[in-house]
Amino acid sequence: MTKQGNDTQKRFFNDNLQTVDVAIFDAIRGEFERQQHEIELIASENIVSRAVLEAQGSVLTNKYAEGYPGKRYYGGCQFVDVIENLAIERAKKLFGADFANVQANSGSQMNQAVFLALLKPGDTFMGLDLNSGGHLTHGSSVNMSGKWFKSISYGVRKEDQLLDMEAVERLAKEHKPKLIIAGGSAYSRLWDWKKFREIADEIGAYLLVDMSHIAGLVAGGVHPSPVPHAHIVTTTTHKSLRGPRGGLILTNDEILAKKINSAIFPGLQGGPLMHVIAAKAVAFEEALQPVFKDYSANVVANAKTLAKTLQSNGFDIVSGGTDNHLLLVDLRSKKVTGKCAELALGRAHITCNKNSIPFDLETPFITSGIRLGSPAATTRGFAENEFIEIAHMISEILDNLGMAKSDEDNSAVEMVVRKKVEDMTNKFPLYSYLHTC
C-alpha cells in the first residue's frame, strides 16, 4: 500500500465527525443545544443514558446477523448472540413474560408483525379511535392497518372522556373481530386489561395490548401490567421506558411466540439492528434497577402536578386529570388552537405537540388541544416544584395568546418565559461530558 493509501485508511478509521462532515456535526450540535435549553414535554420522547448512547453508537453497527441467536445465516455472530440473548432475558425478567422478541425496528413494525402473524388481509379487528387517544397503527384509514384490514373503532364517553367499555363489548359481539387492540398514544387513564381479555375470550378473539406509552410505568410498578392478560403485548423501547427507538414483542404463549418470530424474520425484516438491540439490553438492565421504580413514580407524580396546576389556572384537562405520564389539554375555552399553542410554547422553548381531543371538530393539522408529558423532564431531574412552575409558564403564554391579536402581540410574554426556561434548564445539564467536546 502506498503512503497516500495508508494515510487515507488511517483517516477513515480515526477522523471524527467534525472533521469529516461539519454540516452534520453542526446540526447534531444544534440539536444537543436545543435539548439542553428547552423543556421537553412531548409525551413520546425521553432522554437516554450515556450508556445507551454508547451501545447504540458502537461497532455493532457493522455486523449483519440475519436470523436468531444460534440460528444465524451469517458467520461471526458469537458476540451479537450474547447481546441479543441478554436483551431477551432482561426483557422477559423486566415484564414477567415467557417469550420476547427484541428485533422489531420500530413500533409500527412490531404491530405489523402481530397483524402478519394473526390476521389475513380483510380480517376484522378493533382498536381505539385516533381522536379518543388511539394510534395510527390501531386502524387509522391512512395507515396500513386501516387499508389492509377492516378496522372497527371504539372510543371514549362524551360526558367524561373515559373508555366506553359497554361500547367495546357491544361492538365486539356485533363485529366478531379476530383481534382486539387495547392501548393508545393519548389516553391518560388506567386500562382494565382484565375486562378486555374477558371480552376477547367471549368472542374468541386475540387480545393485543400496545403499551408503548406506559411500558416504563409498567416496568416501574406504577401501572397495572397487561402481560398476564393479553395474548401478545407490544411496546416501543423509548418513551417512558427510556431506551433507544425500537420495538419489543412479549407473549406467554409458545405457539404465538413462534409465529411472531417468523413474522419479524423473515416476514418483515432482514438483518436486525444489533447496535440498537445492544442499547435495548442496556435500557432493560437500567429499568431492572430499584432506582427506576422511583423514576416511574416521579413521572406519574409530576404529570399529576402539571395537570392539577393547569386546572387551578383555569385550563380544561381531558377526562379531568391523569393516571400516567401524559395529559391532554382542551384549549377551546381559551380560544386557542393546538397548532397556535404548540408554536407559541415552542417560541418560548417549551416543546409539546398539538393533539386532537375526543370529538374534536378541528383537523389533525390544527386540533383543539395539546398533549403534555413528564418523562423527559423527569429524567433531567425536574421535580414537582419545577412542574408547578412549568404549568404557570404555560398558562402565562396561552392566556395571553388567547387575548392577543397576533403572534407579535404575544412576543413580550414569550420572551419573559423563555428567560425563565433558560434559568431552569441551566440548573439541569444534559451529558456534561459533551460540553467539552
From Swiss-Prot:
Catalytic activity as recorded in UniProt: (6R)-5,10-methylene-5,6,7,8-tetrahydrofolate + glycine + H2O = (6S)-5,6,7,8-tetrahydrofolate + L-serine
Family (UniProt): Belongs to the SHMT family.
SUPFAM superfamilies documented for this protein: PLP-dependent transferases
Keyword Cell inner membrane: no
Pfam families, per the entry: SHMT
Molecular function via GO: glycine hydroxymethyltransferase activity; pyridoxal phosphate binding
Positions annotated to bind (6S)-5,6,7,8-tetrahydrofolate: 130, 134-136, 363-365
PANTHER family named among the record's database cross-references: SERINE HYDROXYMETHYLTRANSFERASE (PTHR11680), SERINE HYDROXYMETHYLTRANSFERASE 1 (PTHR11680:SF35)
Compartment annotation: Cytoplasm
Name of the featured protein: Serine hydroxymethyltransferase
EC class: transferase
Range of residues in the leader sequence: none
Gene: glyA
Gene Ontology biological process terms, A to Z: glycine biosynthetic process from serine; tetrahydrofolate interconversion
Location of N6-(pyridoxal phosphate)lysine modifications: 239
Function as written in the Swiss-Prot or TrEMBL entry: Catalyzes the reversible interconversion of serine and glycine with tetrahydrofolate (THF) serving as the one-carbon carrier. This reaction serves as the major source of one-carbon groups required for the biosynthesis of purines, thymidylate, methionine, and other important biomolecules. Also exhibits THF-independent aldolase activity toward beta-hydroxyamino acids, producing glycine and aldehydes, via a retro-aldol mechanism.
Organism placement in taxonomy: Bacteria, Pseudomonadati, Pseudomonadota, Alphaproteobacteria, Hyphomicrobiales
Residue(s) at site: Plays an important role in substrate specificity: 238
Cellular component, GO annotation: cytosol
EC number(s) on file: 2.1.2.1
Associated pathway: One-carbon metabolism; tetrahydrofolate interconversion; Amino-acid biosynthesis; glycine biosynthesis; glycine from L-serine: step 1/1
